[in-house]
Amino acid sequence: TSEIANKNAHLLIRISDLHPATNEINLNFICPDWSLNRNPEFLYTLFVPDRASTTFPCFDQPDLKAQFKLQLKIPQAWKSVANRSVEKEEILDSIKTLNFKLTKPLPTYLFAFSAGKFDTISRTKNGKTCVLYHREKEEELHNNTDSIFSLLFHSIEWIEKYTGIPYPFEKYDLVAVPSFQYNGMEHPGATLYRASSLFLDAKPTQQQLLKRANLIAHETAHMWFGDMVTMPWFDEVWLKEVFANFIADKVVTPIFPEFNFDLQFLLAHYDIAYSVDRTSGANAIGQKLANMKDAGSLYGSIIYHKAPIVMRMLEQKTGESALQKGLQQYLSQNAYGNAGWQELIGILNTAQTDDLPRWSASWVQEAGRPHLKTTVDEKNMVIEQLDPFEKNRLWPQELDLAFSENGKITRQNIALNSIKEELKNVFSGGNPEWIYLNSKGKVYGFVELDSTSVHYFLNHFSSLTDDLLRASVLTDLTENLYENKLNTTEYL
């Protein structure tokens, strides 16, 4: 037994205390409260991204996974939940001692436990039992419990089928935390949710129902994408989020057939991503992170809104089946380990004729967005891609050209893989009423509209009966306003 010095948040172990071969170090310490989130009647841990080391000695690096064995001593009347189930329980003098099973390999930010005056409800389906820890009133439970478990089991089953990998952890328990800081946090076996995000009013709107379903699907997707396979370093925190968003959208689509999900996606992501990407201070999806202390600075609109757009582009480029197979290989090859975006691109690139690494470098490592414009010469058209920062960069993508001649709309898909694309004999007469490169709302960039198209859209906007086309046109008209290609008087 010896004293260990504590300096600059590091424990200094003397060389003289170490011996050749294997060493085992046991530490006795008192946990600070910084990340224990204590309340009078409950507490919960929240270690993301680098706070585990404020509670116990460890290296907060996602590529250093460990197996955790936890013992808790809590008041007898309290309940507790952690990553694994309890293997031994003892009660002495009104103190409950709980010993939890050894976890799968986890990064420190996913190690978790909660304890307090919780009630529990459980449901079992196909041999899998899930438990909901909550502090809600009976009326709130009556209106929501069945829906919560139905969404949870649907999410698990759908993702198991999509990935070809059974649920990768022992259990899935939910903890509904009053006034939780986030909507959810994907601790395997003890996933935290903001209580108000799960327990809706008696007459929720369809949007509220969709939001809850998407949240449960998102956190469930993390069990495979982020928990089982984790990014090597937090500079790729965007990766676990984009995977979870991508999968969640697929999970909820069959539940809400009345929704236009392409329209929902456009409205949810493009305006917010553009609000950053049109500025001189835009940042790339992939960013450098020198120190884990700065990991929180990486979160923002580009991670949560541009990255999903790029992920959707990747599926469009590879095809749904090829991407699914690539993700299955990505997960199976790196189970309970670490892998990043480049590993996925490497897997997908072996089956692609296109240069995916080049495509990825443009969209993930570069900040900003392309500027797209058209020029018409009688029956011919030229599409140019300009770099707003004048670096001569290229962002390859699929364009959804549409134009109207004599009231007839023609559509054409165009793969833009160069700075300039010349199209011959596109038009029959050379005088289209309007030309639009983004008719399906999937093109990313500043789509400059020619004056004829602007005039038509502003004067015939209500005649555009396709909801997606109308929303896309409005988005791009707004961007033309921001880029000084359209004056305020015209726009209003």
Segments the model singles out, each with a brief description of its role:
Residues 7, 100, 132-396, 406-408:
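Hydrophobic alpha-helical and helix-loop surface patches within well-folded domains
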Residues 17-19, 24-126, 133, 146-147, ...:
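Extended, low-hydrophobicity, Ser/Thr/Pro/Gly-biased non-transmembrane segments
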Residues 1-17, 36-43, 83-93, 398, ...:
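Solvent-exposed beta-strand/loop surfaces of large extracellular or lumenal domains
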Residues 10-12, 53-58, 66, 161, ...:
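Short alpha-helical segments and helix-capping/turn motifs at coil-helix boundaries
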Residues 13, 27-29, 72, 132, ...:
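Preference for bulky hydrophobic residues occupying beta-strand positions
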Residues 270, 301, 391-394, 406-412, ...:
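Long, ordered, helix-rich scaffold segments
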